[in-house]
């Protein structure tokens, strides 16, 4: 179940547009073997929430008739999981030319595994993260990532709560905040 499927007032990032912009960037650089390293989240009685980044990645790849199954991995949203998922790809001999990670922490773990397997970033494998964590600009090479506007989310969230409570609106309000691609040095044309 995706968060959007709940019948509640909600504010979320426009994950689909964000993922599409990252994947458009990679395909524009010539990449076809694009791995996805994501995480799983659960709510309540351990009900799996479908991550919007996962859904958008699959939709994009299917729409463009690009085979993603050998390059698709889901673990958790941690550094260690990023390392493990990337190593699984190497062990299965499914070596992508690019990696799209569901967050910057996973991307950093993947970058560690890439280096440990004697590949170079971006010469051999390009990497894109998500969230634009502060450290992402200072690692080597600086990580290309999707900027998630936390401040804007807070402002819009407060406005949404105010409007919903003061106007006694019965229908749930839903809003999406745009994200933007921040191009740094972890990707290259092939």
Question: PLM ranges: what are they?
Answer:
Residues 3-190:
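Bacterial carbohydrate/catabolite-sensing allosteric modules
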């Amino acid at each position: 179940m995706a968060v959007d499927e709940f019948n509640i007032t909600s504010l979320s990032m426009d994950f689909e547009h964000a993922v599409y912009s990252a994947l458009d960037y990679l395909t524009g650089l010539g990449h076809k073997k694009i791995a996805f390293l994501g995480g799983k989240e659960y709510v309540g009685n351990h009900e799996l929430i479908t991550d919007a980044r996962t859904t958008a990645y699959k939709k994009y790849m299917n729409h463009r008739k690009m085979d993603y199954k050998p390059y698709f991995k889901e673990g958790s949203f941690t550094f260690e999981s990023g390392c493990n998922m990337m190593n699984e790809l190497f062990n299965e001999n499914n070596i992508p030319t690019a990696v799209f990670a569901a967050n910057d922490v996973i991307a950093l773990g993947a970058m560690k595994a890439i280096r440990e397997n004697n590949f170079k970033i971006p010469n051999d494998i390009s990497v894109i993260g998500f969230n634009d964590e502060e450290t992402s600009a200072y690692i080597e090479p600086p990580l290309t990532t999707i900027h998630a506007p936390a401040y804007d989310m807070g402002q819009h969230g407060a406005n949404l709560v105010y409007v919903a409570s003061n106007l006694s609106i019965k229908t749930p309000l839903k809003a999406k905040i745009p994200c933007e691609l921040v191009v740094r040095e972890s990707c290259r044309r092939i």
